[in-house]
C-alpha cells in the first residue's frame, strides 16, 4: 500500500499544515507552536517539492487483473516478472523513466529523447501460462530493432521466461514476458 502513495504529496500536505499552523501561531503569539510549525513545516514543504520534481508516476494496468490471473501469477510468475510489475506500479524517485536502465543495457535507448516509454501493463493467461505484457510507445525504435533484441531481452530478464515482441499499432510495441514455469 505504501508504494502506491506519493511521498511528495505526503510531504507537501504535512509540511503545508505545519507551516500554516506556524503562521497562525505567530499571529496569535504562541512562540513554541510557531517555532515547531516553521522548523518542521518549511523543510517538509521543501522536501515535498524536491520529491515532486523527481517523481515518476506508477504505470497503470490497461485492464484490471482478474482473480483467476492473480492466482495464476501467484503460482507461475517468475521473480523477474514480479519485480518488474512491482517496480513500475509504484512511485519512483530520481529516475528519468520506468525501466530506463534496462532499456539502455539492451541497446533500446540510444538517447533520452529516443527512449521508448512504458505506457501500460497487462497480465494475461496464455494457454495456462502467466504472461506480463509491457506496452511501450516507441516512435524512434522500429519493430525490427525490437525483434533483433528479442533473444537479448529474454536472456536479460532471466531464466524461465520466453519473450515475444509485437506491434499492435504503429509506433506501439508490446513485449510479452511469458513464464515457462509449470504448475506444481
From Swiss-Prot:
It comes from Synechocystis sp. (strain ATCC 27184 / PCC 6803 / Kazusa). This is Thylakoid membrane protein slr0575. One of its GO terms (cellular component) is plasma membrane-derived thylakoid membrane. It is a multi-pass membrane protein. Its main location: membrane. Pfam families: DUF2854 (PF11016). The chain crosses the membrane at residues 5-25, 31-51. Keywords: Membrane, Thylakoid, Transmembrane, Transmembrane helix. It is found in: Cellular thylakoid membrane. It comes from the Bacteria. InterPro entries: DUF2854. The lineage of its organism: Bacteria, Bacillati, Cyanobacteriota, Cyanophyceae, Synechococcales.
Amino acid at each position: 500500500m505504501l508504494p502506491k502513495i506519493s511521498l511528495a504529496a505526503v510531504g507537501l500536505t504535512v509540511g503545508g499544515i505545519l507551516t500554516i499552523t506556524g503562521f497562525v501561531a505567530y499571529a496569535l503569539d504562541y512562540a513554541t507552536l510557531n517555532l515547531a510549525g516553521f522548523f518542521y513545516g518549511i523543510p517538509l514543504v521543501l522536501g515535498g517539492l524536491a520529491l515532486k520534481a523527481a517523481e515518476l508516476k506508477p504505470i497503470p494496468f490497461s485492464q484490471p487483473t482478474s482473480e483467476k490471473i492473480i492466482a495464476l501469477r501467484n503460482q507461475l510468475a517468475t521473480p523477474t516478472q514480479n519485480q518488474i510489475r512491482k517496480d513500475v506500479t509504484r512511485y519512483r524517485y530520481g529516475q528519468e523513466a520506468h525501466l530506463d536502465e534496462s532499456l539502455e543495457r539492451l541497446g533500446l535507448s540510444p538517447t533520452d529523447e529516443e527512449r521508448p516509454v512504458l505506457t501500460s501493463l497487462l497480465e494475461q493467461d496464455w494457454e495456462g501460462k502467466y504472461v506480463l505484457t509491457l506496452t511501450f510507445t516507441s516512435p524512434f525504435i522500429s519493430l525490427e530493432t525490437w525483434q533483433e533484441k528479442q533473444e537479448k531481452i529474454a536472456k536479460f530478464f532471466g531464466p524461465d521466461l520466453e519473450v515475444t515482441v509485437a506491434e499492435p499499432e504503429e509506433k506501439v510495441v508490446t513485449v510479452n514476458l511469458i513464464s515457462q514455469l509449470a504448475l506444481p
